[in-house]
């Protein structure tokens, strides 16, 4: 990997790459899952792009599948069938599916209420309802694919300073390591901002937002149960907040092989803000509380991994297009995770925009 702050594409020498930057049709700010996916969608249509990411990308070996990084996230994402189809279209799904677990059935219930709703892939006549994938694996494969594409130039450790629009394009200035003397300028026909909920580009364009604080926090982690998941996703509504338990693949098996203490599942539990500490500190207490809220639908919870807490709010950009700039991903709309559609909505936006630009 090249030194931080330089383009990462290995198809050209550094001077050639810097010269090529000025010829790019599209600038993308934000190199997370949405930004990388959009760059790959553009490349699929033969459109060149330059992507700026404020963080340092991790060093990844294409031959070492065990590589992980905190940058690539320790959470899991439920991919809809449409999102899976999009990755199939650009030829990436074969690389992703070894760490993805399909959802064949969905169960929905409410604590203290009789009955439940259940969806089954056979009855609905679909291959599956989607896939649950490790964010670390998804990010790793997206980054490797972007680094290997001759149509994508990656620049990491880059902070955007200014955005100026002209009749026929956009000029953006950025600096490395946050130092003004390192400032550089890029030009392109279109700028697409995928730089997250607190988007710098959105703020520089003076695009306002409508924000709602749910006063809730999502507790996210991985647990193990004594019963195989059988590719069932379960959503349980409890007084403490909605709780989802999703099937996960075993890193060394097919998702139903026993792993360490039991069978792996992803947990997303929404609780009132201020109560998250009790879900994070003591594993035994967390498992006991989880068992009480969930019952035996997934079997007995026997182990818990490290958990993270993520404050929840809804953020909607007042507009998603301003001149030659497009706001996309969480910069455009950050949603509550209860339906698991945030990333999938972003992917639909990215797919449609790439098609329009082609």
Where are these regions (language model features)?
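FAD/FMN-dependent oxidoreductases across multiple families
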Residues: 277-358
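A short, basic/flexible loop-to-alpha-helix module at the beginning of a structural domain
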Residues: 2-23
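Central beta-strand plus flanking loop segment that forms part of the substrate or channel wall
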Residues: 198-233, 239, 243, 271-275
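Conserved N-terminal helical subregion
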Residues: 17, 21-22, 81-89, 94-204, ...
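Beta1/beta-strand and adjacent pyrophosphate-binding region of the FAD-binding site
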Residues: 18-34
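Conserved FAD/dinucleotide-binding core of flavoprotein oxidoreductases
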Residues: 118, 238-311
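Glycine-rich FAD pyrophosphate-binding loop
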Residues: 29, 43-73
């Amino acid at each position: 990997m090249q030194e931080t702050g330089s383009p990462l594409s290995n198809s050209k020498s550094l001077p050639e790459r810097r010269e090529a930057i000025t010829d790019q049709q599209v600038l993308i700010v934000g190199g997370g899952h949405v930004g990388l996916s959009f760059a790959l969608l553009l490349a699929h249509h033969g459109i060149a792009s330059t992507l700026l990411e404020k963080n340092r990308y991790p060093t990844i070996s294409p031959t070492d599948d065990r590589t992980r990084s905190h940058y690539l996230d320790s959470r899991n994402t439920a991919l809809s069938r449409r999102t899976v189809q999009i990755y199939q279209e650009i030829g990436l799904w074969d690389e992703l599916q070894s760490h993805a677990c399909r959802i064949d059935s969905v169960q929905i219930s409410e604590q203290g209420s009789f009955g439940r709703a259940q969806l089954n892939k056979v009855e609905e006549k679909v291959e599956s309802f989607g896939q649950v994938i490790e964010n670390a694996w998804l990010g790793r494969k997206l980054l490797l694919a972007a680094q290997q594409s001759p149509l994508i130039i990656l620049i990491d450790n880059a902070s955007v300073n200014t955005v100026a629009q002209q009749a026929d394009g956009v000029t953006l200035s950025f600096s490395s390591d946050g130092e003004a003397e390192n400032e550089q300028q890029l030009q392109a026909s279109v700028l697409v901002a995928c730089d997250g909920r607190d988007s710098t580009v959105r703020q520089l364009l003076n695009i306002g937002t409508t924000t709602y604080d749910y006063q809730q926090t999502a507790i996210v982690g991985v647990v193990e149960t004594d019963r195989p998941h059988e590719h069932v996703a379960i959503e349980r509504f409890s007084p403490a907040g909605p709780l989802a338990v999703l099937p996960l693949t075993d890193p060394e098996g097919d998702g139903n092989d026993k792993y360490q203490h039991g069978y792996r599942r992803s947990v997303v539990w929404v609780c009132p803000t201020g109560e998250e500490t009790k879900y994070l500190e003591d594993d035994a207490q967390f498992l006991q509380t989880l068992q009480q809220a969930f019952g035996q639908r997934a079997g007995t919870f026997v182990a818990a991994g490290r958990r993270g807490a993520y404050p929840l709010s809804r953020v909607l950009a007042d507009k998603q297009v301003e001149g030659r700039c497009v706001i996309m991903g969480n910069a455009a709309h950050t949603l509550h995770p209860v339906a698991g559609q945030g990333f999938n909505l972003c992917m639909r936006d990215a797919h449609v925009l790439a098609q329009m630009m082609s």
